[in-house]
Amino acid sequence: MMNETSMIEAARSLAWLSWSSIEKNEIDQESLIAERMWRRVLTRPIKENERQLLLDLFENQKSQFRSDPKQRDEFLGIGQWQIPNQSELSDEQRSELAAWSFTARSLWMLSEALTQY
């Protein structure tokens, strides 16, 4: 389920929605993105230890996608739904969105998300 195209597209869409709605002058943008994604998937407030786990996962994935742009672009290219104006984004922005997409995909796989409905 985690690697199905539709799941990857849903995660990418969630990441885009959360990332693109943040004001670029916000302090601690990454925490806000993590919180927004968490609330959309699990419909409850995020606890501090949960936030830190998401941020750690995001940072690890961002580092990996920075070091392997080909892998990043392949991951962002899966499926039909694409990030709007993706070609206009910087390498850093694409790495962030890929990392947030990976993080969102992990959120969808939590047992709490799978059994909520």
What are these regions (language model features)?
Residues 1-117:
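Substrate/cofactor-recognition hotspot
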